[in-house]
Amino acid sequence: MAKPAARTRKKVKKTVVDGIAHIHASFNNTIVTITDRQGNALSWATSGGSGFRGSRKSTPFAAQIAAERAGQAALEYGLKNLDVNVKGPGPGRESAVRALNACGYKIASITDVTPIPHNGCRPPKKRRV
């Protein structure tokens, strides 16, 4: 006797109105993660994952493309308002924020959460080019 087909419930997408965009801009790459208020990730994108390799990963344009990809993916959740947390000294900081603004999000606040050591680890030696 054949078993009856198991019914699967349709997965319901949750709707989130307010979210947080975490932008981690290092010297080598830019990572953009959009979360809800509790910190659950809704979408993310990186410069390297957006098709840029090598030194082109660390450009402001690559950060802009990564922010656009993360922003478009998070629009499916009904996201409207964003708080932006920017971390790191990289070149993609500002262009990523501008790209999120261009996606149609209302940016409520921009916060710099770059960790600053109280004389912790020794920094890398300066480059001689």
From Swiss-Prot:
Signal peptide: none annotated. One of its GO terms (cellular component) is ribonucleoprotein complex. Keywords: Ribonucleoprotein, Ribosomal protein, RNA-binding, rRNA-binding. Gene3D superfamilies: Ribosomal protein S11. GO terms for biological process: translation. One of its GO terms (molecular function) is rRNA binding. InterPro entries: Ribosomal_uS11, Ribosomal_uS11_bac-type, Ribosomal_uS11_CS, Ribosomal_uS11_sf. Located on the platform of the 30S subunit, it bridges several disparate RNA helices of the 16S rRNA. Forms part of the Shine-Dalgarno cleft in the 70S ribosome. Belongs to the universal ribosomal protein uS11 family. Part of the 30S ribosomal subunit. Interacts with proteins S7 and S18. Binds to IF-3. This is Small ribosomal subunit protein uS11. The gene is rpsK.
